[in-house]
Amino acid sequence: MGADGTMSPVLTKRRPDQEINKLDIKPNHEVDIARRAPHSKPPFTLSDLRSAIPPHCFHRSLLMSSSYLIRDFALAFLFYHSAVTYIPLLPKPLACMAWPVYWFLQGSNMLGIWVIAHECGHQAFSNYGWVNDAVGFFLHTSLLVPYFPFKYSHRRHHSNTNSVEHDEVFVPRHKDGVQWYYRFFNNTPGRVLTLTLTLLVGWPSYLAFNASGRPYDGFASHYNPNAQIFNLRERFWVHVSNIGILAIYYILYRLATTKGLPWLLSIYGVPVLILNAFVVLITFLQHSHPALPHYNSDEWDWLRGALATVDRDYGFLNEVFHDITDTHVIHHLFPTMPHYNAKEATVSIRPILKDYYKFDRTPIWRALWREAKECLYVEADGTGSKGVLWFKSKF
């Protein structure tokens, strides 16, 4: 039996990477972004979808997963070595142009490492739980992410996706829950300011203060072992994660005292800022779309909630980000599936999903602006069930 509770099938042969990379998971027709996704109970089950996927797609290979991690580490070292060796040799005007290139490349590569750590939390890295947690703890901690607390809250996000009462993050407000001052930011300058702050500090604010998260009584923080986010069994591991984060901060402090704060910010700080911005950008756009429903407890069920996500195209960054961007729907349906099989699985189930599958081709920055403008709160539209809620923007 597999870790996700399914019987381990006889494995079929995995396609070569060259074939997988050529798979086109985009629908072969333009999707009307204004056309709402179906919200009725789908005519298929999770078992139907699983049966349509080649069995090898569920196989988690420690060797294969490690090869992607080694690739990311090699790129991280290459970018670091190039930055510290060659950028100081450049004339100042060229150096000023080279540093942003390094920051973008290293920050993007860090997001790939972040995704592998996220897979460890889903037990998708290998068949060995202790390996998954050891690797995930090391990777996420090095990126200033408390591995175990995020693993626990993220698991509950997957268990309650698009439930307005029980989802964990990017929980939309009802119209009467929108703070009065939001109306003053519902314009171009306000959105620019809001988006900038959200991208820069949104991820650490969520971890530290549960910003945009599910409301809890008391101080809800991923660093607080007594927060209602966690049960008694999980609190010990919150302490372990906190110790790991403190150790990283101490290492950073020592680097700042020996190499200097400007060096540390240039080599590590700004790339982490880029990483954090990508985390917010990607997760926001995966779960915010004018055509996607949310549900209250009268209508919500797990399958419909998991289907109400959207895949998007980030161009060459899809591969850098291990396809968490363009295969997010399949990830919510089968979170223990490793990323390198997600494209093939998506292609396999798309004929069954039909209109339940959403792929938005809109360029990312245009989509970010549209969603920030149109996805301000949710409410029933009066034409169907009061338990099905849609994004609105008019006050």
Curated annotation (Swiss-Prot):
Its EC number is 1.14.19.-, 1.14.19.16. It is found in: Membrane. It is a multi-pass membrane protein. CDD domains: Delta12-FADS-like. GO terms for biological process: unsaturated fatty acid biosynthetic process. Disulfide bonds: none annotated. Pathway: Lipid metabolism; polyunsaturated fatty acid biosynthesis. InterPro entries: FA_desaturase_dom, FAS_N, Fatty_acid_desaturase. A motif (Histidine box-3) lies at residues 328-332. One of its GO terms (cellular component) is membrane. Coiled coil: none annotated. The chain crosses the membrane at residues 73-93, 97-117, 130-150, 192-212, 236-256, 264-284. It is an enzyme of class 1 (oxidoreductase). A motif (Histidine box-2) lies at residues 154-158. Keywords: Fatty acid biosynthesis, Fatty acid metabolism, Lipid biosynthesis, Lipid metabolism, Membrane, Oxidoreductase, Transmembrane, Transmembrane helix. A motif (Histidine box-1) lies at residues 118-122. It comes from the Eukaryota. It catalyses: a (9Z,12Z)-octadecadienoyl-containing glycerolipid + 2 Fe(II)-[cytochrome b5] + O2 + 2 H(+) = a (9Z,11E,13Z)-octadeca-9,11,13-trienoyl-containing glycerolipid + 2 Fe(III)-[cytochrome b5] + 2 H2O. The histidine box domains may contain the active site and/or be involved in metal ion binding. Converts a single cis double bond at position 12 of linoleate incorporated into phosphatidylcholine into conjugated 11-trans and 13-cis double bonds. Produces punicic acid (18:3(9Z,11E,13Z)) from linoleic acid and conjugated octadecatetraenoic fatty acid from gamma-linolenic acid. No activity with cis- and trans-vaccenic acid, alpha-linolenic acid or homo-gamma-linolenic acid. 16:2(9Z,12Z), 18:3(9Z,12Z,15Z) and 18:2(9Z,12Z) are substrates for the conjugase to form trans-Delta(11) and cis-Delta(13) double bonds. No activity on the cis-Delta(9) double bonds of oleic and palmitoleic acids. This is Bifunctional fatty acid conjugase/Delta(12)-oleate desaturase. It comes from Punica granatum (Pomegranate).
